Swiss-Prot record:
It is a peripheral membrane protein. GO terms for cellular component: nuclear envelope; nuclear membrane; nuclear pore. GO terms for biological process: defense response; developmental process; poly(A)+ mRNA export from nucleus; protein transport; regulation of timing of transition from vegetative to reproductive phase; response to auxin; response to cold. Signal peptide: none annotated. This is Nuclear pore complex protein NUP160. Contributes to the transfer of mature mRNA from the nucleus to the cytosol. Required for both R gene-mediated and basal disease resistance. RNA export seems to play a critical role in stress responses and regulation of plant growth and development. Required for proper expression of factors associated with auxin signaling. It is found in: Nucleus membrane; Nucleus, Nuclear pore complex. Transmembrane segments: none annotated. Expressed in roots, stems, anthers, siliques and vascular tissues of cotyledons, leaves and hypocotyls. The keyword Signal does not apply. Keywords: Membrane, mRNA transport, Nuclear pore complex, Nucleus, Plant defense, Protein transport, Stress response, Translocation, Transport.
Length: 1495
């Protein structure tokens, strides 16, 4: 077996999209065959399965279709063997957010195939999907539009083909399947291949099935063909050939067009028993060499020896037809441990995918040595980043962190969590599903949609709360263990949900299809190998093109071996700690982190580490750890001293070493790309690939530069031990150290851009910030704004999407997925654009370019990230020799300070609190003062006025180029800063800039000459007055009353001074600090009357409902002075304003306003009651108030002058009676508002007609009677009482169609249709009506003495509303009680039996009328002996005979109409009989009366 030479990692895996992308699957049910479905179900059992393909846990594959190419990826998951998932991937779009999941009724075999064809006349591509069931049913799905399907739908039958292949298999088993457009090939256990054309079958055409076999007839009986092991289809000159691998090692090639065999050759392993051919793969035909690469997997079944892939060359020639020949095996590829997942060919390589490794081998037709290149899978990258690998372990991080911090375990715990969180949520490491499952292990339950909706801040808070809850030991070692376990669990879930399944090949692009993601691979350049490799790789540095000799390359290799030793000593801890210290929480100064790390490297870990971990590790274990650390330190120190001494001896001097190192440092500087970027814009998917690849590349460069940084710092610490001269030390300290610091800062900033997730921003709040900072927001970012705040969306995406064509030139063809070369070029262009902009101009310094990129981020609300970037840039500038010069001339440093101040202010505005808020405010103030102090600062800020948040003032001295006053510039800038702090409610900062602006006023106006139009003295006075007014406002906001008063008396503008004084007094009253006015603390002289004036001014211009209320304060003030009338006047004005403003303002609780009005009127009446009756009056509410020179007062005056032109009536004085009347109206309005009835008192002296009706409607009967009795007399009073009781009676009537009954009260007509009220049930309505009857009874008895006819009005109203209603007994009794002596008939008062009888007749209540008449006639006839004498007097008896006659005619009329004939006939007979008896009795009584009179 030939030798294979394996090199270290040749490339990296790049995810196509961030881990936050989760595909939403659209489920589509695929119907089963309609014919003999029961038999298919029966034959689908294991015993009757005719398709027996090799089993696998999960099946996945892919194909590239069309031009431009579209990749289709499909998968059959072991958890859902009856579902096939299809994903479409295109270089012109983003990562697909939806995919198709076809759910079949049967289990699927591990096979599927997709191809495209033109869809007839439409010209659109139509996709066909092949699938196969173990029972032998082929499904062909026609997909016309992959975006048109809806979840839960059923696949249309007219686009579905079922083909049952069992009748054509001759009872053999299917052992292999392959497909090409229009064909499906089934390799059988009898050695034959069945070829089917499902489309032809669907068209009912013949010839849809063919068999590929060696011969026919009797000759075949003597030939035994082994079972088909594998099938593969290859295309040569437009013709498809089927390669068939048999179990005995025979290889047969068939021409699909002619169904003829063109090659038959054995490739079985010779002289080796038990070795069988398992799989077959072919590459694309190479027409230059006439060879098709062919690979066969050999496996020995008897023992556990490794599998081998042998690569053959299948030669073809097309002189006369196509002739094929197979050469002997050229190359052997041994497969070590790990399951082989896939094998693919590219133009010059063969790729093998195993569960934990991707390897490529160059195809060499002449050499027997195959160079193997291994590519780093994402699992290895994630484990290294999470400190779970041997190169980067959490133990190194633990020891280094304990040694780095001198104390404060809280700092250590927070620092540790911050490092792990940053790594965990970094794009390329973060995976949505894996993290959700990890948190599920910790009892954090979220659904997929809920978890996807979490922002970065919310996710961070949840994890930190989990740490706080679960880490109970409260020690740093416990936090380390928790994070190690958490990351281990996360890595496990990541690997379980992202197992490699198959390779995706598109031209020379190699992709990897995982369970839940897709990724590409790009090769590392030779330089990157040398930078990021081990010490053995540093021997080949000629590819770096440093411009040095071969011997110098060897010296450089020794230097890099020294950096490798330092890196090995540390592990991955220093990179993470340095990055977190610079970009994270400011726990350690950026100037201290590297010296501390070097001290640890030189003297070892802190001796207190054993004490810090005593309780966790125990004394013995801690001591062992300390001894081990000391031993490793001694070994490392000796090895480094020997290596550095040998390095110096080899070079001849340290100067030579430093010169070579300087060349190397020049190479580490980010390269400029001078290509003209005029290509098309990057798509979303290419942008994602670019950002992921850039992050991995920049990480290598950053770590390489940081290794040199540590080496140089280490050399400075041990300079005496390696015989370094003072000149060498100076060169190292003053030249190389600043240079490497700049390089590290540049790579760190780029790394920060590509790995830091963008923070979420509320667009509503952000628009306000944009308008306040005057930052341009014209960029259309609606398409990607939703990604802000997600873990997979870094700051680099914002930079890319703001200018998508910034890094693309004409060399790139972005119609396809980017190849490794294109990815590398894009990465280089992107880095160059970030560092040097589009032009790559040398004048684009780090400071200038950082501010340009910061502006792009500020436009998108990334103030936190910008602030950290500017901190890094500022720290880098502190180490430059030209720092002072750049600060004084270019203005870039001033712009940096200005932007950082804006970011700090934004952080304060967004919720910083406590000490952190105070620190950020102080830093922001310091930044703005620094920004104004540099030379040329006004030019830099003035040019970016619309974007950087600075807008030049429109008043005061102007700033013109060539005649610029430093004081004028600072005055403008300080005023702007004052306004910004004021806008953010940061009074302490605004006050400082107001004081600073005051210091510049005199100098700013000194250089301006006086003209007729402009007086600089007056302008300066006005400016000082305005600034002192601002100082007054800010000190008042800060509750610095003494300083506020000093600002008042210092103000030179008398008008502004008076306004401030007014404000000062008002604030004192509002804050409850009025004692300062009278305790002599402040020298107020003659302000007794001004207090009243100012408070009254405040009362007239403030919200009437404010608390404390100025009117009430005035009332109390005048009451204490015994000025009763003024006190009453203030309270009446208070009530009047409430009345006038309450109607036009939408108060939330109008009842509170009315209550305040009642209190005001009551207080006014009480005050006037203390005055002599002859003087108990107040003036009307004044229409004019004292005029003050303010805008509001001037507007009020203008409105007042306009209203004066209209005629006005004279207003009389207001006495107690008028107050009482208004009190009654206001009480009515208040009570109506409590019942949600709208009525407003408009100042009338008499109540309107609708007021009483509203009160009755609202059940406010007492108030209604109060109004009536207050404002009406005589007959008008009786009319209003009747109206009230009529309305009350109507409310007692049940609604039409409501079934209701109450004993002894009333009965409704039962011949109406019964319908329930929509707002209450019959029982509730009945209860309410019963209450209405009781209320009516109470009030009727109360007011019947005032108006005796009220019962008649009530009864008439009830009968008019419902003629069938039964009057309540108590109401009938009121009519009967009106007749005190029944012997006298039905006569009586207004509410008499006769009036009740008349009502019965009027409303058709014939039965009740007859019964009532009969009752009184019987009573008349059965008089007691004592009453007979009274009855026999003249005119002693009266009955309403006219009404009786009407009753008689009504009965006859009813009978004639045919209604109630029997009942009316019976009533008529009773009436007739009673009348006869009554008349007889009357005749006898009359005769007796006549006899008595004549006798």
């Amino acid at each position: 077996m030939e030798e294979n030479r394996r090199n270290p990692s040749a490339g990296m895996e790049v995810p196509v999209a961030g881990g936050g992308n989760v595909v939403k699957w659209i489920e589509i049910s695929v119907p089963s065959p309609s014919v003999s479905s029961s038999s298919i179900g029966a034959n689908s059992s294991e015993d009757n399965e005719c398709v027996q393909l090799p089993l696998s846990e999960d099946y996945a594959s892919s194909s590239v279709i069309g031009e431009p190419s579209i990749s289709f990826v499909w998968r059959i998951n072991k958890t859902s063997p009856n579902a096939l998932e299809l994903l479409q991937l295109s270089a012109k779009s983003g990562f697909p957010i939806t995919g198709l999941r076809f759910v079949f009724a049967q289990t699927l075999s591990p096979f599927a195939f997709v191809y495209a064809d033109e869809g007839g006349d439409s010209g659109r591509l139509v996709y066909f999907l092949y699938s196969l069931t173990p029972s032998g049913v082929v499904y062909v799905l026609k997909l016309s539009n992959t975006l048109a399907y809806k979840s839960g739908s059923v696949f249309p039958l007219d686009h579905l083909i079922h083909l049952d292949v069992r009748p054509y298999l001759n009872e053999s088993r299917v052992t292999s399947v392959a497909a090409s457009p229009g064909f499906i090939f089934l390799g059988r256990s009898d050695g034959c291949v069945s070829c089917f054309q499902p489309i032809v079958y669907f068209q009912k055409s013949s010839g849809f099935h063919q068999e590929l076999r060696d011969d026919t007839g009797f000759g075949r009986l003597g030939t035994v063909v082994a079972a088909v092991q594998d099938l593969f289809i290859s295309e040569v000159h437009g013709r498809n050939y089927l390669c068939v691998l048999h179990a005995d090692g025979a290889l047969r090639v068939w021409d699909i067009l002619t169904y003829s065999r063109v090659l038959c050759q054995s490739i079985a392993a010779k002289n080796l028993e038990g070795v069988m051919c398992v799989r077959l793969w072919l590459g694309k035909a190479d027409y230059d060499s006439g060879i098709i690469p062919l690979a066969v997997l050999y496996r020995k079944s008897m023992n556990d020896s490794m599998d081998v892939i042998t690569v053959y060359g299948l030669h073809f020639s097309s002189a006369e037809g196509i002739a094929l020949s197979l050469d002997s095996g050229l190359q052997n590829i041994p497969l070590e441990e790990g399951e082989l997942r896939d094998v693919r060919f590219t133009s010059d390589k063969i790729w093998t995918l195993k569960a934990n490794e991707l390897t490529s081998y160059m195809l060499c037709q002449k050499s027997s040595t195959m160079e193997a290149q291994s590519y780093t899978l994402q699992e290895d990258y994630i484990s290294e980043q999470l400190f779970l690998s041997s190169r980067s372990s959490s133990h190194d991080l633990l020891l280094t962190t304990h040694s780095l911090f001198s104390s404060a375990k809280d700092q250590i715990m927070g620092f540790i969590s911050s490092i792990f969180l940053r790594r965990l949520l970094c794009p390329g490491i973060f995976h949505n599903v894996a993290l959700r499952l990890t948190l599920l292990d910790h009892n954090k339950n979220w659904t997929d949609s809920e978890f996807q909706s979490l922002s970065l801040d919310e996710l961070t808070s949840e994890i930190l709360l989990l740490v706080e809850h679960e880490v109970t030991a409260e020690t740093s070692i416990s936090v380390f263990h928790w994070w190690k376990n958490f990351c281990t669990s996360y890595l496990h879930h990541w690997c379980s949900n992202n197992e490699p399944r198959t390779l995706l090949v598109q031209s020379d692009v190699i992709g990897l299809v995982r369970n839940n993601s897709v990724s590409l691979f790009f090769r590392l350049e030779n330089a990157e190998h040398s930078l990021g490799g081990s010490s053995s790789e540093h021997s080949n540095l000629t590819s770096l093109d440093l411009g040095v000799s071969h011997s110098d390359h060897e010296i450089l290799a020794e230097v890099l071996r020294c950096t490798s030793k330092i890196s090995k000593q540390w592990g991955g801890a220093p990179y993470a700690m340095y990055y977190e210290s610079i970009t994270g929480r400011p726990i350690i100064s950026s100037d201290e982190i590297v010296p501390r790390l070097v001290n640890i490297l030189e003297s070892g870990y802190s001796t207190t580490i054993g004490q810090r971990t005593w309780s966790d590790l125990g004394a013995d274990r801690a001591w062992e750890k300390e001894l081990e650390a000391h031993k490793n330190l001694r070994t490392f120190s000796i090895d480094m001293l020997l290596s550095l001494s040998a390095l110096c001896q080899r070079a001849g001097s340290w100067e030579k070493v430093f010169t070579i190192m300087e060349h190397y440092l020049q190479y580490l500087v980010p390269k400029k790309s001078m290509q003209k970027n005029d290509g098309e814009a990057l798509s979303d998917i290419c942008s994602s690939i670019l950002v992921q690849a850039t992050s991995q590349f920049v990480k290598v460069m950053f770590e390489s530069a940081f290794d040199i940084f540590l080496l140089i710092s280490y050399l400075l610490n041990i300079a005496g031990q390696v015989n370094m001269s003072q000149q060498d030390i100076c060169k190292l300290r003053l030249e190389l150290l600043p240079m490497i610091q700049d390089i590290v800062s540049e790579w760190l900033i780029i790394l920060f851009f590509v790995t830091t997730p963008a923070e979420s921003t509320s667009m509503e709040d952000f628009s306000l910030k944009l308008s306040s900072l005057q930052i341009d927001s014209s960029i259309d970012k609606r398409s990607w704004n939703a990604m802000l705040g997600k873990c997979g969306f870094s700051l680099a995406f914002i930079l890319l999407f703001s200018d998508r064509s910034c890094i693309v030139d004409g060399r790139f063809n972005l119609r396809y997925l980017p190849s490794s070369q294109i990815i590398t070029s894009l990465v280089q262009n992107f880095i160059s654009w970030i560092r040097y902009s589009k032009t790559g101009d040398d004048s684009s310094s780090l400071l200038r370019r950082s501010t340009e990129l910061s502006l792009r981020l500020i436009r998108n609300g990334q103030s936190d990230a910008v602030e950290r970037i500017l901190v890094v840039v500022e720290a880098s500038l502190r180490g430059e020799k030209t720092f002072g010069c750049s600060q004084d001339t270019s203005g870039d440093w001033c712009l940096l300070q200005h932007l950082r101040g804006c970011c700090l202010l934004d952080q304060v505005q967004r919720g910083a609190s406590g000490i952190l808020r105070e620190r950020k405010i102080i830093d922001a103030i310091r930044c703005f003062f620094r920004a104004s102090s540099g030379e040329g600062s006004w030019k830099a800020l003035h040019s970016l006025s619309k974007e950087a948040g600075f807008s030049p003032a429109t008043t005061g001295p102007s700033i013109l180029d060539g005649s610029t006053s430093s004081a004028a510039w600072k005055l403008h800038y300080y005023e702007w800063a004052m306004q910004i702090f004021e806008r953010y409610n940061i009074s302490e900062g605004a006050c400082q800039f107001a004081y600073a602006a005051l210091e510049q006023v005199d100098d700013a106006y000194n250089f301006i000459e006086m003209t007729e139009e402009f007086d600089p003295t007056k302008a300066a006075t006005y400016t000082r007055g305005r600034l002192w007014a601002n100082v007054f406002k800010f000190t008042l906001d800060l509750n610095l009353l003494n300083d506020a008063y000093c600002a008042i008396i210092s103000n030179p503008d008398e008008e502004i001074k008076r306004i401030c004084l007014r404000r000062f007094i008002i604030v004192l009253f509002e804050c409850g600090k009025t004692k300062i006015l009278s305790d002599g603390h402040l020298p107020f002289i003659g302000l007794t009357e001004k207090i009243t004036q100012e408070l009254f001014w405040k009362a007239g211009r403030s919200d009437i409902m404010m608390k404390p209320n100025p009117y009430k304060l005035l009332y109390a003030y005048e009451m204490r002075r015994h000025n009763w009338r003024m006190a009453a006047s203030y309270m009446y004005q208070f009530s009047a304003r409430l009345r006038s403003e309450g109607a036009c303002k939408d108060y939330k609780h109008m009842s509170l306003v009315l209550q305040e009005r009642l209190n005001g009127l009551s207080a006014a009446m009480n005050a006037l009651a203390l005055v002599h009756p002859g003087y108990a009056w107040i003036d009307p509410v004044p229409e004019e108030t004292t005029r003050y020179p303010v805008k509001k007062a001037r507007r009020a005056e203008e409105e007042q002058l306009r209203s004066n032109d209209q005629p006005k009536g004279e207003k009389s004085c207001i006495d107690i009676e008028k107050l009482q009347n208004e009190f009654v109206f206001t009480t009515a309005e208040y009570m109506l508002s409590l019942k949600n009835f709208g009525w407003t008192y408009s100042g009338l002296e008499k109540p309107p007609s609708d007021l009483v009706d509203l009160l009755v409607q609202a059940n406010l009967y007492d108030m209604a009677f109060t109004v009536v009795l207050k404002f009406w007399r005589g007959s008008a009073l009786k009319r209003e009482l009747e109206k009230i009781f009529e309305n009350m009676a109507i409310k007692c009537c049940p609604a039409k169609g409501t079934l209701w009954s109450s004993p002894n009260l009333m009965l409704t007509s039962n011949d109406e249709e019964v319908t329930h009220s929509p707002d209450r049930s019959p029982a509730d309505q009945g209860s309410k009506l019963a209450g209405d009857w009781e209320i009516l009874e109470v009030y009727l008895k109360r007011y019947i003495d005032i108006h005796a006819r009220l019962p008649v009005s009530v009864a008439s109203t009830l009968l008019q509303a419902d003629s069938c209603i039964e009057l309540p007994l108590w109401l009938i009794q009121m009519f009967k009680d009106g007749q005190k002596e029944k012997a006298l008939g039905m006569a009586g008062q207004e509410a008499s039996p006769a009036s009740l009888f008349q009502l019965y007749v009027d409303y058709g209540r014939l039965t009740e009328a007859t019964n009532l008449l009969l009752e009184y006639m019987e009573s008349f006839a059965s008089s007691k002996p004592a009453e007979v004498l009274k009855r026999k007097k003249v005119s002693g008896v009266w009955f309403p005979y006219t009404t009786v006659e009407r009753l008689w005619w009504e009965l006859e009329k009813t009978m004639n109409s045919g209604r109630m004939v029997e009942q009316c006939h019976k009533l008529k007979e009773q009436l007739h009989h009673a009348l006869l008896n009554h008349l007889k009795l009357l005749k006898v009584d009359s005769n007796d009366a006549v006899s008595s009179a004549t006798g």
